[in-house]
Each structure stands twice: as structure tokens, then as C-alpha cells.
Amino acid sequence: MQKVNEIKNMDCDFIPLVAQVMEIRKRGDVPLAYIRTYGCQQNVADSEQVKGLLSQMGYEFTDKPDDADFILFNTCAVREHAEDRVFGNVGALKALKRKHPSILIALCGCMMEQEHIANRIYKSFPFVGLVFGTNYIHELPQLLYNCLVNGKRLVVRGNKDTTIYENIPTRRDGTFKGWLPIMYGCDNFCTYCIVPVSYTHLRAHETRGNL
């Protein structure tokens, strides 16, 4: 018998804590975030939630990684070319991290749900401070807080929890449109598809929640 998906509201306790840390660090200046999204519409929707969370933590956004305090690549594992681009672009940030040690560089998305890739990132790119999988977006404030306060690298992935988290703030990229995921994951483990690995089993929002 299939387990009924549990629906929870995300824990927002760490949002004001991150805002306080960044206010102290920036001495009143607004912290900036640079988000780069690879892949499908699901990744775009995930990035909109990441931006919503960062906005509530006091961040504004920039198109220039050189100006950012927080850099995040939301990765795609469908095509090898996309993976190669991620490795190349992350490698290019090494000099920037050396110049500005306070920058926090992070990777999320489908690639990070593959153990061999997460291990490669951890070993080959020591300047990357945070790696998290697709099922950890709701924990971003806590992860960010731990990285900023403790200064330790974090890798969190492989979460098979089927809980759906509601009330995650969203910042839309467009004025008149936005992506609305109504379900996540898949129960059909096709050999060519990464979705069941990245997003686990099929689960969906309640109909009234979507409306």
C-alpha cells in the first residue's frame, strides 16, 4: 500500500537569524546573491523558491558573480554537456573565492543527488562551501546559517523523505507568469531518466493547495 504523502509547513526560524548575520557582516550594506539555473522548468521553479527564501533573508540579486556574497548554481544531470558546463563554471570561481574569501559558493540540483558527483565536488573544489540535493530547499535558511556561523563545508543529499513542504516563499522571474509544480518525483524508474533518483517517489500537492 502506497504511503500517503505528509504535508508540512516549512520551518522559518532560521530566516531572521541569517538576516541578522548578514547585516552584521555587511555593516548595513545589502547582501547580494547570484543564482544560475541549468536545465528544466522544475529547476526554474526550484530557483524561484530559493530566491524567495533569500529575499526574506535580506538578499538582493545581481547578474554579476563578482559582486555577489552568495553564489548558487542549480544544476542539471540530464545531459553530460550540462554537467561539463557546471564543472567548468565552478572551476572558474576559484580565483574569485581567493580574492574574496567571504563569498559562499553553493551547488544544488539534480547533479548533487549523484553520489560520485557530490564526492567529486567535495574533493576537487574545496572552495565550494555548500552542496545540497533537490529535497533540501526548505532547509536552505538553516544550511546557510550553519555555513556562515560555523565556517564549515556542508554536503547534504540523498534525502528520501516524501514530505511536501508548503509556504515556501517564491520570487518569480517573470511579471506575468510563474512555474507551479503540482507534483514531484516519479514511480517509473526508466533507465534514461534521472527524476526518480533526484526527486524520489511520486508525490503531489493537495488540489486545494494548488488552487
Residue ranges and their predicted role:
Residues 1-203, 208:
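Proteins enriched for Cys/Gly/acidic motifs involved in redox and nucleic-acid/cofactor modification
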